[in-house]
Regions:
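Cofactor-pocket helix-loop regions in the catalytic cores of large enzyme subunits
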Residues: 1-157
Length: 157
């Protein structure tokens, strides 16, 4: 039953963005340590970890964002805001597979991503680069308990 929920396609992703999951210790993906090590050694792929702790997985990462605990939702909003501001969203996909996107987009128009990232105790330029990589390359997302244990866990999920 453990593997019946969505899993990132670690084998076929160029960028794996992880929020609050230490895959080297918490094996909720079959063969997680082996897959994470292989991904981290591949020069054409990126492992990005968002976690306040320098976990075993964060030590493997190409980029580790040591976020201030409890600010994950704020970081995600900043990232969405940057994607929309820079035009990195997949417009064709959104047109073909969504409805009402303009009403969602309007929620981010006046959002101050720089101030949000500062509240997260992260470097704006580094977050902008992580966001660009995630938005413009073949990417997957993995999140786990670390994301769900904060003050805004319902919003995060």
């Amino acid at each position: 039953m453990q593997y019946l929920h969505d899993q990132p396609d670690v084998d076929n992703t160029d960028v794996l963005l992880i929020f609050g999951w230490n895959g080297m210790q918490s094996h909720q993906i079959p063969q997680a340590p082996r897959k994470l090590q292989r991904l981290s050694k591949d020069k054409d792929k990126m492992l990005i970890v968002v976690d306040p702790r320098k976990t075993e997985t964060a030590k493997l990462a190409d980029i580790h964002l040591p976020i201030r605990p409890g600010t994950d939702a704020l970081l995600l909003k900043a990232m969405i805001s940057l994607i929309l501001k820079e035009g990195w969203e997949n417009k064709e996909y959104l047109a073909d597979h969504t409805s009402g996107f303009d009403s969602v987009k309007s929620c981010f128009e006046n959002f101050d991503a720089r101030a949000a990232v500062k509240t997260c105790n992260l470097d704006f330029d580094q977050v902008r680069e992580v966001t660009r990589l995630y938005a413009t390359r073949k990417s997957s997302l993995r999140y786990d308990l670390g994301l769900f244990m904060g003050r805004h866990s319902g919003l995060n999920s």
